[in-house]
Each structure stands twice: as C-alpha cells, then as structure tokens.
Amino acid sequence: MPDPAHIIAGHKAALSNPHVSEEAKERARKYLKEHGSESHYTTGTTRGQKADADDAGELREEGFGTKNQFEDNESQAKNLGNVRGGYKAAMHNPKVSQKGRRHAKELLEEVDDESK
C-alpha cells in the first residue's frame, strides 16, 4: 500500500507544477482538502530541503528505534566481510589503476588490523 505521506507529497507537487492541467490541480486540491494537506512524517529530503527535525523524536516516542543496522555483532561482521571483499576485488580488477590497487591493499590491511 502506498505511503500516505508520498500520496500527499504527490498532490502538493501537482499543485506547484506548471505542466499539470487545471483539472488535475483541482483534483489534487480536492484530495488534500478531504484527506488533509499535512503528512505526519516527512518522506525525506527533496531539493536540499531538510526533513522535519521532530520526526526522529516522534518515531522514538512511538517505539521505533533509531539503531544503526550495523550495530549488532552479526551485521557488523557481515559488513566487514563485504568491505574486505570489495577491497580484494579492487586489487584484482584489471580496470583499477595501480595506484587504486595499492590504495585498496592499504585499506584492506587497515581493516584487517582493526578487526584483530
């Protein structure tokens, strides 16, 4: 099911788009009037606008955590494996320059040192 915030954002965008017909704009106005023109949560940032600062606090209050996906040990180990694999692949990829390969090797050594 579509996110109500996205639906509202789409109708708001239609109102400010000069390429949208007056008929479509009127339907958008009607929808926003019937369903409310304010979305409870923002859908992210667009064109450099900042998301509502209160959103994270509201989500925490409602029981949604803001835990980083790599905070638990299993996920952290999996991520580390992906990082190591990426550096190894860069070291053996013929399209990567010698400088890039050396840099990947240095970073791989750093990652290995940190994981010990």
Swiss-Prot record:
Signal peptide: none annotated. Belongs to the UPF0654 (con-6) family. Keywords: Cytoplasm, Nucleus. Residues 49-64 have a biased composition (Basic and acidic residues). Its main location: cytoplasm. This is UPF0654 protein C869.09. Residues 32-116 are annotated as: Disordered. It is found in: Cytoplasm; Nucleus. Residues 39-48 have a biased composition (Polar residues). One of its GO terms (cellular component) is cytosol. The keyword Nucleus applies. The keyword Nucleus applies. Pfam families: Con-6. It comes from Schizosaccharomyces pombe (strain 972 / ATCC 24843).
